[in-house]
């Protein structure tokens, strides 16, 4: 990487700009545009770095208003040379995700659309619907994000009827399978009545459904049925026949888009209001719509920006799928800025030609029009939800007599059972929407709170101190401070928080209220009576959603702590087994029962557990006189 820095914009220094451009090689790679403060403004990729970077500073080159504004601020150019264009594409995506440059088109991290996850990292993988991708398990596979969550759940339920799959995260019984095994919904994973290899073969067939390869799966099952019949395994053949028939019902529910078509294709379109863009990606395989994916991104105002958004979506999507899921054709509403590079990369990944098509024929144009209509419907739905949130924030600002809308609202709640395992939650709403990346848990450490005696007031005071003390001491900036704090409770809980905020000289920095559960009453500091509101007001409903989310988050964490403590209580009695090794044991075996049943050899498979400690653990659960 080469860094070139100027105290002013490079546009103001043509000779210096030309020297900088000459330093950049004509090789594939990634380039960075930075301002005079060293902040990264834009990250891009190119087959020929110098040619691409030079194009930004040519008057004849058409630019969007956003890029034109960015170019005026560029005082620094950096680059990383890669061996191939494909490496440049992958590196660019990772760097944009890491740095979030202001002038790049950024996809919104939306939790609204669900994924299907298959946990290939586990010995017996599970399949389930989730709205959050786990980044720490590289082997796990995600399909989506799907727009229609109802249809997705119906599909998964039907699949679980067709193929016997693992249903539970933890076994229900110790020495026998549960009812799911008896009714044929599970192959008895908990008792290892099926080998991991055979189970994974079944799950590979399920994965083919979400890869859009149902026709290929139908052919595979037909071959297996015929082979079973030829081998006189008639019961197995009948079971596969039933699977084929059920699979036909699954396909029957899918919309026919291009009859008699055998080509795999994706069609993508975008609708934007200038503030946000809704993108729809339709996956069509053998003439049937097998997947409808949705994304959100920054707003666009021109065809050039539309192409940038679509390019970013396609790059992110195809980098996360397997080669068999890449279609032979992608239907586009407009040209992509780096379409040739993306096309070459997709072709190399797939192993066969991938075509980008701006449709001229009526059938494909009608298909693209259908995708565009769905993108527009999704944008309108999002606009209505945004308007609803704005109405709630405006109503809340009026109730609390705030000068501006509360952009960031934090809610706090305490959870415990008679003072034991006391924990607190901090949840955050931004623009009226939950922002889970800012949620926090707190374990209450106050030594004055004894087991068997609860003290919500002291617990809340401790949490508020821990939340803001770093910012007060100057160790953290104050950009993440809330506009409004809501406490779950009544006047007592509010008074405890107000008291500690006064000590920290923070009471005038933001508004603090409490929301009592029984009548949804809002209390302000120093007021003996609640504010005159009614429960159906949009602002009150917003606070109630915040309060309920804080309560849910606190109770969930408290339940985890109780479970963890109950698991560790017996392990604490084993000499030489510290806390970190206890965690490794539980992570490996998943339950205390499995640790108890493990052999010395199996115990030694856990990192950090040597032969002597493994024998000690085994002897603890298997005393000689038992």
Curated annotation (Swiss-Prot):
The keyword Cytoplasm applies. One of its GO terms (cellular component) is cytoplasm. Residues 26-105 form the GIY-YIG domain. PROSITE patterns: GIY_YIG (PS50164), UVR (PS50151), UVRC (PS50165). It is found in: Cytoplasm. Transmembrane segments: none annotated. GO terms for biological process: DNA damage response; nucleotide-excision repair; SOS response. Pfam families: GIY-YIG (PF01541), HHH_2 (PF12826), UVR (PF02151), UvrC_RNaseH (PF22920), UvrC_RNaseH_dom (PF08459). Keywords: Cytoplasm, DNA damage, DNA excision, DNA repair, Excision nuclease. One of its GO terms (molecular function) is DNA binding. Residues 215-250 form the UVR domain. This bacterium is considerably more resistant to UV and gamma irradiation than E.coli; the E.coli-like SOS regulon model is not an appropriate model for DNA repair in this cyanobacterium. Interacts with UvrB in an incision complex. PANTHER family: UVRABC SYSTEM PROTEIN C, UVRC/OXIDOREDUCTASE. Belongs to the UvrC family. The UvrABC repair system catalyzes the recognition and processing of DNA lesions. UvrC both incises the 5' and 3' sides of the lesion. The N-terminal half is responsible for the 3' incision and the C-terminal half is responsible for the 5' incision. This is UvrABC system protein C.
């Amino acid at each position: 990487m080469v860094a070139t820095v100027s105290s002013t914009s490079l546009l103001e220094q043509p000779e210096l700009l030309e020297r900088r451009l000459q330093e950049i090689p004509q090789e594939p790679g990634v380039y960075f545009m930075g301002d005079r403060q060293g902040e990264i403004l834009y990250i891009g990729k190119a087959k020929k770095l110098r040619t691409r970077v030079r194009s930004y500073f040519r008057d004849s080159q058409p630019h969007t208003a956003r890029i034109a504004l960015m170019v005026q601020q560029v005082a620094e150019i950096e680059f990383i040379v890669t061996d191939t264009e494909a490496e440049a594409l992958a590196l660019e995506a990772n760097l944009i995700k890491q740095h979030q440059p202001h002038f790049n088109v950024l996809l919104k991290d939306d939790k609204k659309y669900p994924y299907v996850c298959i946990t290939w990292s586990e010995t017996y993988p599970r399949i389930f619907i989730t709205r959050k991708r786990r980044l720490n398990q590289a082997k796990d596979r995600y399909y989506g994000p799907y727009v229609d969550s109802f249809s997705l759940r119906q599909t998964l339920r039907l699949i679980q009827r067709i193929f016997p799959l693992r249903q539970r995260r933890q076994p229900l019984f110790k020495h026998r399978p549960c009812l799911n095994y008896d009714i044929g919904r599970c192959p008895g994973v908990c008792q290892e009545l099926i080998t991991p290899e055979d189970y994974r073969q079944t799950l590979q067939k399920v994965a083919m459904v979400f890869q859009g390869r149902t026709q290929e799966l139908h052919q595979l099952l037909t071959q297996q049925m015929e082979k079973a019949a030829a081998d006189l395994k008639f019961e197995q053949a009948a079971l596969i026949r039933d699977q084929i028939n059920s699979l036909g019902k699954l396909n029957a529910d899918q919309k026919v888009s291009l009859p008699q078509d055998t080509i795999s294709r994706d069609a993508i379109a975008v609708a934007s209001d200038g503030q946000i863009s809704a993108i729809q990606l339709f996956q069509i395989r053998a003439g049937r719509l097998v997947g409808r994916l949705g994304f959100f991104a920054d707003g666009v105002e021109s065809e050039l920006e539309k192409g940038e958004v679509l390019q970013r979506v396609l790059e992110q999507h195809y980098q996360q799928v397997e080669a068999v899921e890449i279609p032979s054709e992608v239907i586009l509403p407009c040209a992509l800025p780096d379409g040739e590079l993306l096309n070459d990369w997709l072709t190399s990944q797939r192993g066969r030609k991938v075509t980008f098509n701006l449709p001229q024929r009526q059938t494909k144009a009608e298909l693209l029009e259908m995708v565009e209509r769905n993108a527009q419907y999704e944008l309108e739905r999002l606009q209505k939800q945004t308007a609803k949130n704005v109405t709630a924030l405006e109503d809340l600002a009026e109730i609390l007599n705030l000068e501006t809308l509360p952009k960031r609202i934090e809610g706090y709640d305490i959870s415990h059972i008679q003072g034991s395992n006391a924990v607190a939650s901090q949840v955050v709403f931004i623009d009226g929407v939950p922002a889970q990346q800012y949620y926090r848990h707190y374990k209450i450490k106050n030594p004055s709170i004894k087991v068997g005696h609860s003290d919500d007031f002291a617990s809340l005071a401790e949490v508020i101190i821990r939340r803001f003390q770093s910012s007060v001491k100057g160790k953290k900036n104050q950009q993440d401070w809330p506009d409004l704090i809501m406490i779950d409770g009544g006047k007592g809980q509010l008074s405890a928080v107000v008291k500690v905020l006064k000590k920290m000289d923070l009471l005038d920095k933001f508004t603090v209220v409490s929301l009592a559960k029984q009548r949804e009453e809002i209390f302000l500091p120093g007021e003996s009576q609640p504010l005159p509101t009614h429960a159906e007001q949009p602002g009150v409903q917003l606070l109630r959603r915040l309060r309920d989310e804080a309560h849910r988050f606190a109770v969930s964490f408290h339940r985890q702590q109780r479970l963890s403590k109950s698991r560790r209580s017996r392990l604490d009695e084993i000499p030489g087994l510290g806390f970190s090794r206890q965690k490794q044991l539980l992570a490996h075996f998943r339950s205390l029962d499995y640790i108890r049943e493990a052999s010395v050899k199996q115990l030694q498979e856990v990192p950090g557990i040597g032969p002597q400690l493994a024998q000690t653990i085994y002897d603890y659960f298997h005393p000689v006189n038992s």
